[in-house]
A protein has these predicted regions:
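Residue-level detection of the helix-turn-helix DNA-binding "recognition helix"
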Residues: 37, 48, 77
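A short, Lys/Arg-rich alpha-helix, primarily the initiator
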Residues: 2-27
Length: 109
C-alpha cells in the first residue's frame, strides 16, 4: 500500500505533468496545449504551479496522455486539502463534532 506523506505539501499536478509526462515524452507545453485544445498560457500556469487542474483539463489530459482523469483530480484535491488545512487550521480546530451521526440509506422500503 502506498502511503501519502502528510507532513509535507503534496506535489503540484503541474510538476507531475512536467516531470513525468512532458519531459520524458519530449513534448513542449505549446504542443500539449495545441493537442488538447487549451491556451498555452493555461498549460504554462499549471506547469509553473500558478493554476490548478480543473475537471475539464483533467479530462483533456487524461485522453491525450492515456491516464485516468481521476489521476489528475486526485493530485489536485490532495494539494487543495493540504493547503486549506494549513490556512484554516485554527478555525477548523474550533469546530466541535456533532453529538450524533445521521446515517441514511437510499432505496429502502
Amino acid at each position: 500500500m502506498v502511503r501519502i506523506p502528510t507532513h509535507r505539501r503534496p506535489t503540484h499536478p503541474g510538476q507531475m505533468l512536467k516531470e513525468e509526462f512532458l519531459q520524458p515524452m519530449g513534448i513542449t507545453q505549446r504542443q500539449l496545449a495545441d493537442a488538447i485544445g487549451v491556451p498555452y498560457r493555461q498549460i504554462n500556469e499549471i506547469v509553473n504551479g500558478r493554476r490548478g487542474i480543473t475537471p475539464s483539463t483533467a479530462l483533456r489530459l487524461a485522453k491525450y496522455l492515456q491516464v485516468s482523469p481521476d489521476f489528475w483530480l486526485n493530485l489536485q484535491i490532495r494539494l487543495d486539502l493540504f493547503d486549506i488545512k494549513q490556512k484554516e487550521s485554527e478555525q477548523i480546530e474550533k469546530i466541535l463534532p456533532s453529538p450524533t451521526t445521521v446515517i441514511t440509506s437510499e432505496g429502502g422500503s
